[in-house]
């Protein structure tokens, strides 16, 4: 019985920690980590090099024309 109660308490604590991070912030972190477009400012992750946003994905930036390929 003690084990079940402990498990329920631990589950509730983990769930509350997961809910502490807003969904949009979590998505922004995820997009930034994989090099996609950051939803808030529509820019690519700076570490991905010269790239620009096209929808939700980053594409190579044409240096000469300054627009997405």
Swiss-Prot record:
Pro-piece positions: 21-34
Subcellular location, principal: secreted
Compartment list: Secreted
Keywords: Amidation, Disulfide bond, Knottin, Neurotoxin, Secreted, Signal, Toxin
GO MF terms, alphabetically ordered: toxin activity
Pfam families, alphabetized: Toxin_7
Disulphide connectivity of cysteines: 37-53, 44-58, 52-68
Signal peptide start and end residues: 1-20
Tissue-specific expression: Expressed by the venom gland.
Source organism, top-level taxon: Eukaryota
GO cellular component: extracellular region
Family label: Belongs to the neurotoxin 01 (U2-agtx) family.
Known function: Insect active toxin causing rapid but reversible paralysis in crickets. No activity shown in mammals. Does not show effect on mammalian voltage-gated calcium channels.
Domain notes: The presence of a 'disulfide through disulfide knot' structurally defines this protein as a knottin.
Designated name of the protein: U2-agatoxin-Ao1z
Organism: Agelena orientalis
